[in-house]
Design a protein with these regions (language model features):
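C-terminal, surface-exposed recognition/capping segments
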Residues: 2-156
Length: 156
């Protein structure tokens, strides 16, 4: 990563805030044809507040659990609802782990994971979802040189 570009995964997007702007797929987007990385706000429906929940180290409190738009408990991932207030269909996001750029090994398989979004945080850091049994951060950001999961969305 040379830190020169904001828009590696969304050609017309240099905004560094979380947003729902249309993603214009770039040649660097790892998604298959017809799909792209989702907008940076795509994962905000995973909590009722659209904000990060939990601290990543201690179990959820009853109040925090009420803020999660999930079906059941963490079981090597979460079943998230497609609509607000625990409604709609459910779909599974596995806790697949992640790969840090150095030394390039996998971490926290079935315990924690990250999923990339298209939006930048700055030139070196991208937006993503991260979760474990102790937190769901739908508005997270991490160095773009890490190997995270991709959950592509159909292009608009």
């Amino acid at each position: 990563m040379d830190g020169k570009y904001y828009n590696l995964w969304s050609t017309d997007n240099a905004r560094t805030d979380n947003n729902d702007d249309v993603v214009i797929k770039s040649v660097y987007d790892p998604s298959p044809v017809g799909y792209s990385l989702p907008a940076s706000n795509a994962f905000t429906g995973f909590t009722t507040t659209g904000q990060n929940v939990g601290d990543g180290y201690t179990p959820f409190t009853p109040e925090q659990l009420a803020q999660l738009n999930i079906n059941g408990n963490f079981n090597k991932g979460y079943y998230f609802y497609t609509k607000p207030n625990k409604s709609g269909k459910i779909f599974f996001f596995p806790a697949s782990g992640w790969r840090y750029h150095n030394p390039g090994i996998m971490y926290e398989i079935i315990k924690r994971t990250h999923y990339w979004a298209a939006g930048p945080y700055n030139r070196n850091i991208g937006r993503n979802l991260v979760f474990s049994s102790f937190h769901i951060y739908c508005l997270d950001y991490s160095g773009r040189n890490a190997g995270f999961c991709v959950r592509s969305a159909e292009e608009k």
